[in-house]
């Protein structure tokens, strides 16, 4: 601190010692990580610090003692022409301060009439308090505040957070004031009176169970302050303590300084508290998936439902929305036209034209009366001897004429040899436009069954030229789908493919239908349809699953271990866990 100018008599000594003490001596050995050389590293360094930075002793003492150096207080009649210098406020000297006393003269005369306090004529000193022997102290029989008996074991704040709002309809102050109490408000314990005579070993209590209309709400004591009543003259006097600190009791109170608090916010806090009561099982398994977020702000809906008597007491918070299955809106069809406010169209049945216009469902024409059907061809194909002529040349010419007459009708195209989808002229499913009738569609698919049709349709007619056993002769398809001829050089196929196809065509229709259902190699064209009434074809994965054996796997695992089995009875002496009293367990066993 700098020296106060004009007052050299106060501070004439410097701070610090002239000689460096060994306590503050330091060098590189003591502080090797010190980057800057400390002022107390050596004696020369310390003297340089003393000369560069001179710190004088603080001017404590007369100015800071009782009275201190103050201007002289004189009445107006004794005011001098010039202001006198400052003197000591009291006439006694103070020892132990850093400066000199000023002045060292006679004590300063004190003038008590300069202030409002007057000198007392009763007491010999200036004390305004009466002497203890002469004072009369009377007892005041009033309750005084005391500390809670268990105040040292009570938390100063709330240990657990609370969601209760003072404006709550079911647990707030309004619910505590009404009679009878709602079931959400706890009541105070019953008053009990102890009737016990001194020396009697038994304890007698009288418990007063009031009616519901006279019960009181439960409150925590000590929120304001505890008061104790003074005892009588004969008994011991209470010990007075200072006023105890205020106890923080978890009682609800109206916060008048918070204008935002309202019944709507109290309802939100109540719903937030009820939402924490839900278990994880209730939240995740609702039957329709996980629970949606809860509607916390439903004060208006509750008020309307309470007026209409639609809800009970303290209802649980509801979800904001519920998952509902909504089918997709079809782009076309009857439902789409109804949604678009358009007129629905009448169903049009498309009838396929018959191959022969002269044939009727009951009566055939003259040509088809002697031409065998495809079933007859398949049945007779294996029994026709070689070299037998079935019809003459006139019949063949008539067949050619009939073909030329029926050339305007559309005939099926040529099929590949190995393509089963073209062999069976199957329409998988008609086009579905009414997508809302999902249940009808499901039962329709279940009842639908793929009916295999023969390769040679009964409506087609076949040439009887060169008709031989299909197992021996090789025939393949030509642009004319109903005629068979010998293979040419350009239409030559492999022997295995032709044999497979002819063998497939040579089977009867009933046997062919059974093979379609039972044979694993011959599967439906559309594959397996879920929920269509047909079992799903098994794969090799099920066989692999059934072939696994846990016992066999364990046996193979034990056989793969070439080392000897470990004997658990052997004593192990290595490791940190085998140290006892600083010695290894090896020395105890051996």
Curated annotation (Swiss-Prot):
Official protein name in the record: Sperm-associated microtubule inner protein 4
Residues joined by cross-link Glycyl lysine isopeptide (Lys-Gly) (interchain with G-Cter in SUMO2): 427, 545
Keyword terms, alphabetized: Cell projection, Cilium, Cytoplasm, Cytoskeleton, Flagellum, Isopeptide bond, Phosphoprotein, Ubl conjugation
PTM annotation (Phosphothreonine): residues: 219
Cystine bridges: none
Modified residues (Phosphoserine): 407, 422, 485, 547
Gene Ontology CC, one term: centrosome
Matching Pfam families: SPMIP4-like
The keyword Cytoplasm is annotated on this UniProt entry: yes
Described function: Microtubule inner protein (MIP) part of the dynein-decorated doublet microtubules (DMTs) in flagellum axoneme. May serve to reinforce and thus stabilize the microtubule structure in the sperm flagella.
Source organism, top-level taxon: Eukaryota
UniProt xrefs under PANTHER family: C5ORF31, CHROMOSOME 7 OPEN READING FRAME 31
Gene: SPMIP4
Modified residues (Phosphotyrosine): 442
Main location: cytoplasm
Subcellular localization: Cytoplasm, Cytoskeleton, Microtubule organizing center, Centrosome; Cytoplasm, Cytoskeleton, Flagellum axoneme
UniProt key word Phosphoprotein: yes
Tissue: Predominantly expressed in the testes.
């Amino acid at each position: 601190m700098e020296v106060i100018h004009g007052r050299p008599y106060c501070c004439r000594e410097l701070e610090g010692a002239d000689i460096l003490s060994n306590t503050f001596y330091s060098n590189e050995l003591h502080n090797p990580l010190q980057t800057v050389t400390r002022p107390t590293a050596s004696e020369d360094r310390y003297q340089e610090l003393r000369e560069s930075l001179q710190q004088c002793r603080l001017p404590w003492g007369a100015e800071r003692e009782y009275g201190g150096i103050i201007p002289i207080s004189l009445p107006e009649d004794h005011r001098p022409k010039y202001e006198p210098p400052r003197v000591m406020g009291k006439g006694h000297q103070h020892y132990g301060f850093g400066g000199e006393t000023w002045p060292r003269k006679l004590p300063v005369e004190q003038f008590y009439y300069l202030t409002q306090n007057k000198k007392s004529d009763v007491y010999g000193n200036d004390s305004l308090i009466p002497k203890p022997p002469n004072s009369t102290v009377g007892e005041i029989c009033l309750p005084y505040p005391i500390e809670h008996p268990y105040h040292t074991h009570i938390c100063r704040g709330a240990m657990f957070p609370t969601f209760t709002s003072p404006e709550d309809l079911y647990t707030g102050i309004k619910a505590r004031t009404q009679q009878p109490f709602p079931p959400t408000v706890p009541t105070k314990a019953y008053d009990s009176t102890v009737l016990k005579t001194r020396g009697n070993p038994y304890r007698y209590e009288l418990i007063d169970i009031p009616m519901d209309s006279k019960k009181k709400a439960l409150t925590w004591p000590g929120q304001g302050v505890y008061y104790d009543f003074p005892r009588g003259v004969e008994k011991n006097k209470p010990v007075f303590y200072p006023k105890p600190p205020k106890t923080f009791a978890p009682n609800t109170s109206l916060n008048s300084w918070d204008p935002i608090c309202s019944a709507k916010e109290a309802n939100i806090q109540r719903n937030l508290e009820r939402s924490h009561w839900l278990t994880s099982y209730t939240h995740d398994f609702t039957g329709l998936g996980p629970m949606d977020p809860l509607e916390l702000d439903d004060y208006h809906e509750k008020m309307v439902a309470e007026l209409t008597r639609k809800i009970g007491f303290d209802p649980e918070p509801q979800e904001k929305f519920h998952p509902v299955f909504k089918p997709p809106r079809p782009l076309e069809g009857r439902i789409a036209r109804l949604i678009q406010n358009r007129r629905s169209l009448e169903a049009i049945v498309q009838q396929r034209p018959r191959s022969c216009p002269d044939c009727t469902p009951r009566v055939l024409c003259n040509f088809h009366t002697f031409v065998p059907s495809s079933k007859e061809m398949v049945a007779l194909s294996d029994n026709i001897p070689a070299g037998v002529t079935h019809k003459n040349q006139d019949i063949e010419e008539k067949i050619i004429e009939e073909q030329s007459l029926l050339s305007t009708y559309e005939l099926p195209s040529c099929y590949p040899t190995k393509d089963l989808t073209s062999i069976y002229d199957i329409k998988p499913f008609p086009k579905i436009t009414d997508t809302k009738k999902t249940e009808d569609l499901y039962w329709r698919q279940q009842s639908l069954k793929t009916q295999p049709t023969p390769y040679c349709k009964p409506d087609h007619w076949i040439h009887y030229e060169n008709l031989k056993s299909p197992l021996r002769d090789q025939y393949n398809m030509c642009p004319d789908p109903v005629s068979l001829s010998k293979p040419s050089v350009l239409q030559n196929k492999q022997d295995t493919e032709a044999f497979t196809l002819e063998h497939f065509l040579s089977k009867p229709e009933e046997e062919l239908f059974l093979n379609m259902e039972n044979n694993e190699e011959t599967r439906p064209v559309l594959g397996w349809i879920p929920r269509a009434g047909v079992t799903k074809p098994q794969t090799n994965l099920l066989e692999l699953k059934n072939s696994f054996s846990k016992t066999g796997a364990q046996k193979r695992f034990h056989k793969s271990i070439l080392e000897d089995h470990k004997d658990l009875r052997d004593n192990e002496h290595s490791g940190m866990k085998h140290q006892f009293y600083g010695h290894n367990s090896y020395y105890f066993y051996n």
